[in-house]
Amino acid sequence: MALNQRSRTVLTLYSARDCVHCHRVRMALAAKGVAYDHVVVDLDNPPEDLLDLNPYNSVPTLVDRDLVLYDTNVICEYLDERYPHPPLMPVDPLSRARLRLAVVRIENDWLTLVDQIEAGGKAADAARKSLRDDLVKNALAFKASKFFLSPEISLADCTLAPLVWRLDALGVQLPREAHAVMDYGERIFRSQGFARSLTADEKTLRP
């Protein structure tokens, strides 16, 4: 969607203070080293201009001059193409398709559980157990490479690392046999790019 009445010279990101989906976009921006204006959105009282930009009034919303994007995957892939270095997706079609599928699996299998846990209620405990059990079951995938299924950081990491960062805050305690998940997290968390992706609120989610 393009808005001709708006003209911007830098990227503007509308993002919540603590949102796993917004964090994905901030992590991609940090990995690219791209400067941007960050508008922190109170989801209970969003700014009026957000509704003018995005008919769903949702975050994350990215504005690049006259272009407005408001789907997390669309935003992340746009950033990777708009700022090609360092790449966050493989070059060849087969590997790109596999990475996209990994992102879809993380979203559908795990991030939906994060949303359920954060929503609270009776479903939260079941979602917490499902997330814990599924991470344990897939722990070996976290040590197959330095990053998730890749020797280099990718959009899969931008999707997964914000989840791993939140595990303690979500009340998801992993057993020793899933140490590969937390080892993966520590490798990511030590990077300057990850530190730059955090809001002040998100920095408090881990001791």
Locations of the language-model features?
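GST-like domain detector, emphasizing the conserved glutathione-binding G-site
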Residues: 1-135, 139, 146
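Non-globular targeting/processing and membrane-anchoring segments
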Residues: 2-3, 202-207
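Residue-level detector of family-conserved "landmark" positions at structurally sensitive sites
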Residues: 39, 72, 177, 198-199
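Conserved beta-strand edge residues that scaffold enzyme active sites
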Residues: 43-44, 181, 202
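Conserved residues at the C-terminal ends of beta-strands
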Residues: 65, 161, 200
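Short, flexible loop/turn segments with low-complexity composition
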Residues: 91-93, 196-204
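GST-like fold's C-terminal all-alpha helical module
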Residues: 106-197
